[in-house]
């Protein structure tokens, strides 16, 4: 199965008890190769396909689902696609999560 890393626990402000954070999954080379192959065939999984991958790879369905979500998000970010609502809000000057420096008029420097 996948290896997981130890987690440093942070204390939350309310009751001082450590917040449980799920450790990051370290996929094996074989698991990654299979996930990438499946993703190349289809960027979205059916429930049946997710269950089959879970059995084949020794991962939970949630781990597989999240891997696919993260992979889609990474591709979307790399391709520069913008959400239509984000574009509309940016046009109104209400939304800018860009890391490009801009002047006081919102023009790129």
Curated annotation (Swiss-Prot):
- Which CDD domains does UniProt cross-reference here? homeodomain
One biological process term in Gene Ontology: neuron differentiation
Q: Where in the cell is it found?
A: Nucleus
Domain of life per record: Eukaryota
Keywords assigned: Developmental protein, DNA-binding, Homeobox, Nucleus
Which stretches are tagged as biased composition: Basic residues?
1-12
One GO term of the cellular component aspect? nucleus
Provide a Gene Ontology MF annotation, just one: DNA-binding transcription factor activity, RNA polymerase II-specific
Q: Region entry Disordered: which residue ranges?
A: 1-27
Q: Which residues bind DNA?
A: 20-79
Q: Which family does it belong to?
A: Belongs to the engrailed homeobox family.
Q: What is this protein called?
A: Homeobox protein E30
Q: Which organism is it from?
A: Apis mellifera
